[in-house]
Amino acid sequence: MTQVTVKELAQEVEAPVERLLQQMREAGLPHTDAGQVVTDNEKQTLLTHLKSSHKSKAEEPRKITLQRKTTSTLRVAGSKSISVEVRKKKVFVQRSPEEIQAEQKRELDERRAAENAARDKVEAEVRQRNEEQARRQAAGSAAAAPAPAAKPEPAPAAAPVAAPAPVVADAPASEDAAARAAERKKDETRRNESRTRDDDRRRGEAPRVSIKVKVKEKEKAPTPRAAPRTTDEESDGARRGRGGKSKLKKRNQHGFQNPTGPVIRDVTIGETITVSELANQMSVKGAEVVKFMFKMGTPVTINQVLDQETAQLIAEELGHKVTLVSDTALEDSLAESLKFEGQTESRAPVVTVMGHVDHGKTSLLDYIRRAKVAAGEAGGITQHIGAYHVETDRGMVTFLDTPGHAAFTQMRARGAKATDIVILVVAADDGVMPQTREAVQHAKAAGVPLVVAVNKIDKPGADLDRIRNELSVEGVTSEDWGGDTPFVKVSAKMGTGVDELLEAVLLQAEILELTATPTAPGRGVVVESRLDKGRGPVATILVQDGTLRQGDMVLCGSNYGRVRAMLDENGKPVKEAGPSIPVEILGLDGTPEAGDELSVVADEKKAREVALFRQGKYREVKLARAHAGKLENIFETMGQEEKKTLNIVLKTDVRGSLEALQGSLGGLGNDEVQVRVIGGGVGGITESDANLALASNAVLFGFNVRADAGARKIVEQEGLDMRYYNVIYDIIEDVKKALTGMLGSDVRENILGVAEVRDVFRSPKFGAIAGCMVIEGTVYRNRPIRVLRDDVVIFEGELESLRRFKDDASEVRSGMECGIGVKSYNDVKVGDKIEVFEKVQVARTL
C-alpha cells in the first residue's frame, strides 16, 4: 500500500492544502499537518463526507423502473403480417424504515378497529337471538294459559321484550355498512401482512408474536369460520391461491418456537450398546457420536459395540442423564421365579466312565447293561456321550459314557461337570495314557471322587502295581497304599469284578448323601443334541433335580420350547422323568449347545424373552471379541504373507461331534496353512450348505450324515468335493493330507560324490583338465558340481567331461582315478575338491 501525505493528496486533487485540511476536519479526521499520512479508509471517509455535502450520497436509488418490451408478428390473410409490440412498465419504490413502521402501526390500528367492529356485530347478533328466543318463550307460555292472558296484568311483563325493538329495526343498515368496511380492511390487512412478512424475512428479523397471537385469537372465534364465504372472498382467495399464499395456510400456522436450551434426555445403558442405539437414545444422528469419538481419539463405526463405561462417558459429555442397568436383571428375575420347594429325597448317583481310547470303557458298560453298544459305534470307538440308567440289586445307577479320543476333550469336560462319581478305566496291559491323565484333571476340576477300574486283568501282560505307581504320580493314590481312591480289578470280557465295582460306586454315593426334590419343576443339563430329519431338534437331557414332564415349557440356553415328547434311552416314550434320569426331549426351536442348563419356566412369554436376550448377548459378545481380535492382530499380520486356507463346510449328526471336530480341525496347520470351518451345523447336508461351499470354494464334509437331493444336484453340476465320514480318525487324517499338499515341496540337495584334484592337464578342446581321485561317493557325468578351495565354494557349474584312461565314462566310483573337465572354468588347482550333487524335491509335512 502506497503512503500518501496530505500535501501529496492536495497536489493530486489540485486543491490547496489549507482547504483540504479544513475539509478533513469537517469529516472528523484528526489531520492537522500537511506531512501526516492519509490511509485508504480515511480517503473513503473524506470522499463520503464530500459527496454528502454536495447532496450526492452513494446509496441505492429509492425508485427503480423496469421496462419490458415484447415484439411479435401476426400473420393475416393475403400474406400480410402485423407487428405487435407490447410494453410493460414496473416501478419499485423503496420505503424508509420510518414509513414502514408508520404503515405497520396504521395497519395494526385498522385491524384492531375491524376486530372490534366484528366483535360488536357478533355481540349484537347474539343479543338479538336471545331476545327473540325470550319473546318466543313468553308467547308460548301465554298461549298455554288463556285465562290469565285475558287480564291486563301480563302487559307489563311483555314491555321489556318490546323495548329494544327500535334498536333491532335500525341494526341491519348499520351492520351491512360495518361488514363491508370490515371486509375491505380485512383484505387490505392480509396484503399488508404478506408484505410485512416478506420484509421481515429479508431483514432476518424475528416474527411479530403479537400479530400471531391476534390471528390465533381470531381463529378461536367460532362465528367467522361458520359464516359463509361471499363471492368477493372466493375470488380473492382464488387470486391469492395463484400467488402461493392461501387463507387456509395462514389459519393452520402455529406459534411453535425452537427450544432455546439443549434438551437433556434420560439414557439407559446396559453392559454393551452399539453406537447407533446410543445415538437414538440421545436423539442425535449416529454420525455425531462417531465424530465425537473421533475427537476423543477413538475411531469407531456406527455398528460397533461400546462397553458401559465408554457409553456413559459419551452420554455425560454430551449433557444427558445416564441410567446404568445390569444385563443380568432378566436372568436374576428368572432365577427368582424358579423355586425348588418340597421334601428332599435321596437320588441315584450319576456316574461318568472316562479313560483312554480302547481301554474298554464301553465294553464294561455293555456288560453292566447287558447290551452291545460298542458294536454299533463306527470303528468300535465311542464318538457320542451315551446316557442311560441301570437297575441293579443295590439300587439304580445312571451312567454317562464319554469318548476317549483326544478330539473329545470338551465332551469329557461336560461329562465330569454333570456327574457325581467318575469311574476311571485303565487297561492293565497299557497303563496310564494321555487321555487318562486328562480325565484325572477333569475329575479334580469338577471336584468329584474317583473310582479306578483296572480293566483287562485277564490278559497276560497285566500289571496292577504299575498302574498304581503311574496314577500316584498324577495324585491318585490307592486305598491299599494309604490313599482314598478305591482300585477295583475288572474284566469287561469275562465279567470279573463288576459287582465289586458297582458296590464301590454305591458306597461313594452313600458318603456323598445325594438328594433331590422330585416335586419341584425339572432342572437338568444338556448332554447331547442333534437334528433329526423326521422329528426336528432332539436333545438328550440329564435331569438333575425336580421332575420333567411332557408338556412343560422349558428354557435351554438360547433355545426354548414345549416338551412334545419324551423318550428314554431305549427309545420308548415316557410321560415324566425324575432326578438322575436321562431322557430325549422333542419340541425345542433349535439344537442347544451341549452343557447348557435346562429349566422349566412358567409361561412361554418368559421363556421367549430370556432366550432372545441370551441370543442378542451372545451375538454382541461375539462381535466385540472379533473386533478386539482385529485390533490386536492388525500390527502382527502387517507385512506377513497371507496364509493358505482350507475352507470346510462341516455337518455332523450331533452337537458334541461338531464341537469336537471344530476344535480338532482348528488346531491343525502352521504359519503357512490353516483350516477354517466357515459353516457348521447339525443335520444332513442341505442345498444351502452346497451353495455356501460353492461360493467360498470350500470342501463339504459329512460326519455320520448324508446330503439331500438338492445338495447332490449342486455338487454334481459344479464339481464340488464332498466326502462322508463315520470315524473321526479318518477326517483328521484327510485334512492333514490336504494341508500337506497345500504346503508344496522343498528342494533338497543330495551330495553324490567328492573328487580331489591331484594334477592339472591342458587340453586344446576342454581347456584345463583336473586329474582327480574320487574320495567319497560316486561322480556322475552331466551333473551340477561345486569347486571348493579350502572348503570355500569358489565356483558352481556343470561337469562337462568325465574320462577314465582316455575313455568317456558316465560314472566313476570311490577310490578310482578320473579326468574331469569343468564347463567354462579353467582355474583349477591341485588340492581343490570337486563336489558332485543333485537337487531333489521333497514333500513338506506339517
Swiss-Prot record:
Gene Ontology CC: cytosol
Residue ranges annotated as compositionally biased, kind Basic and acidic residues, are: 96-135, 177-206, 230-239
* Region G4, annotated ranges: 455-458
Which controlled-vocabulary keywords does the entry list?
A: Cytoplasm, GTP-binding, Initiation factor, Nucleotide-binding, Protein biosynthesis
Region named G3: 401-404
Checking NCBIfam families in the record gives: IF-2, small_GTP
Q: What is the protein's given name?
A: Translation initiation factor IF-2
As recorded in Swiss-Prot or TrEMBL, the protein's gene is named infB
